[in-house]
Amino acid sequence: MLNKFFKTIHNKYSRFFKFIFFLRYLFAIFFVSISLFLIIPGFFNYEKKEKLIKNYFLESYNLKISEYENIKYKAFPIPRLEFKKTRINFLKSNANFNVNYLQVYPKIFSIYNLNNFEASKIILKENDVNLKTSNFYTFINEISKLRKKIFFNDLNIKIINDDKLVVKLE
């Protein structure tokens, strides 16, 4: 009796169980391929491609990266490039940024193709900015006119006039 009951259940739902077991393998393949797609760029040498990234900053944001300590790629939770201890110059306003952490979030397909590099957003963390009083207005205008996303975390602004500190905003 028990054997008959087991056979009827097995025969009745066998197509459903086969489909569920097939989905299990399909999800495993999908998960492995996505994780490999995100992890493999961590082995690339971004020091060789620095000119392409610097050129993108210059064209899109009017930012000139003059110095940095190193570039690292981090895949999780969101793929990003991290520059440490970076010195950046705003070209039109002559503002000098000293940034401890510059995070660039590239678009998904521009992780592999750095010739057509595009970033979805940029985060500047722990910034020190030195501005002259004459360049303050142009600096504010340039930041407000940017079409691409740029975020500042922990921004310290020093406004200087004739080598004297006028205002320090933290």
Segments (PLM) and residue ranges:
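N-terminal type II signal-anchor transmembrane helix
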Residues: M1-Y61
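Aromatic-enriched hydrophobic runs in primary sequence
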Residues: L26-F30, K64-I65, R87, I157
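Flexible beta-edge/linker motif
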Residues: G42-K51, Y56, E69-L165
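A short, amphipathic edge element
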Residues: N62-N70
